[in-house]
Structures are given as structure tokens and as C-alpha cells.
Amino acid sequence: PRALNSFRDAFSIWHENHPLAEPVRITLPVPPGTDLSRVHVYRHVGGWSRQDTERSASGLTIETRRLGLFQAFEDRHAPYLNVTSPPPNYHAQTKRPILTARVADAHSGVNGFGATANGEWLLVAYDPEHGELRWDRDEDLNSGTQNIEFWASDHAGNVSRKSVTVVVP
């Protein structure tokens, strides 16, 4: 992926359509002392796709049933996050206003998400098909000014936070 840092050269293992009866484990060695906290192995199939990656002192290991082109990339980019409802400094008409945000991560993928109102957790659902976080509106918000904060993290540990102020009746 263009926006990711290439960790080392790509490596090709056999042909990508070669059938495998059982999954194989592939380990990519790394220099001792390398910080691997944001590094994953990606497989190229029409585009780069993150593979579940085990990290150890000896290297990066994946288990796969498909061979082909692999490369390690470091993801230092936080997910895209944008509050879509309500607008800033919104004066709500109800104690359960609609609270939504758009989220996407084109690199290692969305791994975690949440929202709070003045530090109190809100029950939030994530719709990956539409890239949307939505408060379930399961209980009333407290009256007064509420700082609503959405957050999202990716598989590399990068985190985005966005907030909006809502005045609740």
C-alpha cells in the first residue's frame, strides 16, 4: 500500500494459485531489536491485504492456505474518523439525539471503536459495510453540555479521536 512504510522487500512463494491441502506457516526474519508493534505481513491479490501476523524476536509469522507475493509493512496512520451527527454545538430536542461517525482504515483495518459522553461509555455499534459508528440510544444522556467523543483504532494500534459538543435538555 502506498501510504504504508515498506519494512523490507516483497517475497514471492510459488504461484498464488498453487493449491495447498493444509495451511503453511511462513516466517519472515527481522533484525534483532526491531520494533514490530505496528508491522504486519500483507499478501498481494489484486491489492495488498493484511494477514494475521504473529510477532516474535525471530520474526513475523503468518499461517496461510494461499501462496504468492508477501511483504511486511508498517502502519503509522490512524483510522479516518469524522463525526457526522450531530453538528458542532448542537442543541438537542431529546435526551437521546442521533450520534454517528464515519470510520475507515485502508491499511491494517479497524480493530476497535467506542464513544463516551463526558467520559461515560456509550453503547455503540459498528457497521463495517457502511463504515459507520452509531450510538444505540439505549439510555438518556444527562441534561446540560455533553462532550461526545468517538474513537477508533486499527490493528497496528493507531488511534483517532473526534469530539463534538451537544447541549441536552
What are these regions (language model features)?
Residues 18-20, 89-95:
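Short, solvent-exposed loop/linker segments at the N-terminal edge
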Residues 61-78:
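C-terminal beta-strand-rich structural cap/linker in extracellular carbohydrate-active enzymes
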Residues 1-45:
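Proteolytic processing hotspots in large secreted/extracellular or virion-associated proteins
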Residues 76-80, 86-87:
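Proline-centered linker/hinge motifs at extracellular inter-domain junctions
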Residues 65-67, 96, 143-147:
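Extracellular Ig-like/FN3 beta-sandwich strand-entry sites
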Residues 25-31, 98-106, 151:
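Short edge beta-strand/loop segments characteristic of extracellular beta-sandwich folds
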Residues 59, 106-169:
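Long, low-complexity serine/threonine/glycine- and acidic-rich segments characteristic of extracellular
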Residues 44-66:
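Short, surface-exposed beta-strand/turn "edge" patches of beta-sheet domains
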